[in-house]
Amino acid sequence: MSQVMGVLNVTPDSFSDGGEHLAVEAAVARGLEMAEQGAAVVDVGGESTRPGARPVDPAEEQARVLPVIEALADRLGDRVRLSIDTRHDSTARAAVAAGATLVNDVSASLWPVAADLGVGWVAMHMFGDPRTMQDEPRYDDVVDDVRRFLVERAGAAVAAGVAEVWVDPGIGFGKTTVHNMELLAHLDVLVGEGFPVLVGTSRKRFLGELLARSDAGQAPYGPAVVAAPAPAVDPVPVTDRVDGSLTTAMWAMIHGARMVRVHDVDVTVQGVAVLSGSIPAPEDPLRSPA
């Protein structure tokens, strides 16, 4: 059965919930709520990686996340895993010392840290960095380019001794809406490489664009639209993207994703419960290829 990772942004500027959980008490309360709703993992992040986001100094990042991770580790024990969403070596190490057991790495570069500390590691694909990643991202073949990058990084992690390696195609990270849809449509290509796949589509801009196109009576994205784009429309607000988020999370799980990263844990857990009755669970969802 697929797992649900709950997003806990301890930031002032995240695209979906920036500022909502900046206070330690609010962040801890939200983490406990997601655990109660059925999240298998609570992913704590202290640096926004939305398009155009400013870099955050690791010391500032750690000041945001470490008290939250420590409090959640104390309250949750082994019932729910804690993950650190970071691209900084020092933050990953400090978070693991505070209780995190998974490094969710948007830079796909921290496998030596995971190997050293004996924790799990997620390699995510990103074109460029958050400041520039949406500046006309281009690929020869987005599905194959992402696959090759992630397989190379995951292979390096396995060779270094990381026992638990996940791969994430990085939906929305240096990709157009068409790129995102192609990656979802061909998720089986990445799943077929044998590493457990994590997918995060929750509340992202491409969903807002798709929903706005539908509301405006425009055709869905496809070859004809790419060749002759319809007039641009403003994406629907973040708060109106829950249904689209759930739909794409269900699609990802049906097509082999072992974990989905979401803001709306409660409805996603319900979706997992429905799917679990009809889709056999893998024998070992954390298996890495030999």
Please describe what each predicted stretch is.
Residues 1-2, 7, 13, 153:
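Proteins enriched for Cys/Gly/acidic motifs involved in redox and nucleic-acid/cofactor modification
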Residues 2-6, 32-46:
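N-terminal glycine-rich anion-binding loops that anchor highly charged ligand groups
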Residues 3-5, 164, 196:
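Structural motif
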Residues 12-33, 49-75, 81-82, 87-89, ...:
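Active-site-adjacent loop and "lid" segments of alpha/beta metabolic enzymes
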Residues 170:
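Conserved Motif II region of HX4D acyltransferases
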